[in-house]
UniProtKB/Swiss-Prot annotation:
The lineage of its organism: Bacteria, Pseudomonadati, Pseudomonadota, Alphaproteobacteria, Rhodospirillales. This is Large ribosomal subunit protein bL31. The keyword Aminoacyl-tRNA synthetase does not apply. Binds the 23S rRNA. Disulfide bonds: none annotated. The gene is rpmE. GO terms for cellular component: ribonucleoprotein complex; ribosome. Part of the 50S ribosomal subunit. It holds the Pfam family Ribosomal_L31. The keyword Cell inner membrane does not apply. One of its GO terms (molecular function) is rRNA binding. It comes from the Bacteria.
């Protein structure tokens, strides 16, 4: 293998939405990855729809497109 061309592959801790944790290996730059949605909370697996807006993205979208609509 060529040296210095591959990303750093190291152990990280993945934190699920319920607070449980597990360790895996990844090229993710941080030491810990906190999930906003996972198989325990995803609507496709639970059958329950819930709205998740962790970074204000939904509010930003609604503000940007508030006046947008089909005009008759």
């Amino acid at each position: 293998m060529k040296k210095d061309i591959h990303p750093d592959y190291h152990d990280i801790t993945v934190v699920m939405t319920d607070g449980s944790e597990f360790v895996t290996r990844s090229t993710y730059k941080g030491e810990s990855l906190r999930l906003d949605i996972d198989p325990k909370s995803h609507p496709a697996w639970t059958g329950v729809h819930r709205l998740i807006d962790s970074g204000g993205q939904l509010a930003k979208f609604n503000k940007k497109f508030a006046g947008f609509g089909l005009k008759k």
